[in-house]
Amino acid sequence: MFTKRREAVASLLGPDACLLVASNNHVSRNIHHTYSFRQDSYFWYLSGFNESDSIVLIKTDKTGSLSSYLFVPPKDEHSELWDGYRAGPQGAQNDYGFDHGFNNFDADKTIPGLLAGANKVFSLIGYKEDFSQRVSSWVKEARLKDRHTAAIEHLDAGPLLSSLRRVKSDSEIEIMRKGCEISAQAHKSAMQFVAPDMNEQSLEAYYLYKFAEHGSRFPAYTPIVA
């Protein structure tokens, strides 16, 4: 499914083009803990990869043929002991179907070379300011590497990706239906559970529990319990 999505994106990019999309990153809650991680929807759409600090790069050559790259957190026994399994660059290829996998710390030295020679570079301009600045710096460096890249266009990928995401496959529609069923049941259960003198925190905890009970890690939207 994700490979087909990358192929669909490549067909819209045209020849000699690149697309860059970043994952979400962990957000610190305090010095030793982070908030629950939820992957960026655009990044997930193209990769199915649920780790932070990662980058998808899709590149087309002069014929429009696709090459896919995934920059991921490196394998680290100590970190994996505490935070869970990491796929690593090899897993990006073997488990997620990317043509090439790299450690994320190689992005700054690798990506400008991949962009060199492209006519167009697409990214979600202004969506994540820090990443947008990194992409701009990579484009500038790519221009210095290849005189043919001097006229490179840096374009917003939002309209392109949104046009694909609006059209749902049968499997996506089924997931949405399942999500609606879980949401409806959670609301019904919360209404049956509520009682006089119950505080909002208890009701919210029960409501979120019902999502987890039926197989959903998160609700579709953060609930307002008042």
Specify the residue positions occupied by each region the protein language model found:
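Active-site cores enriched in adjacent His and Asp/Glu residues with nearby glycine-rich loops
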Residues: P15-I31, R177-A226
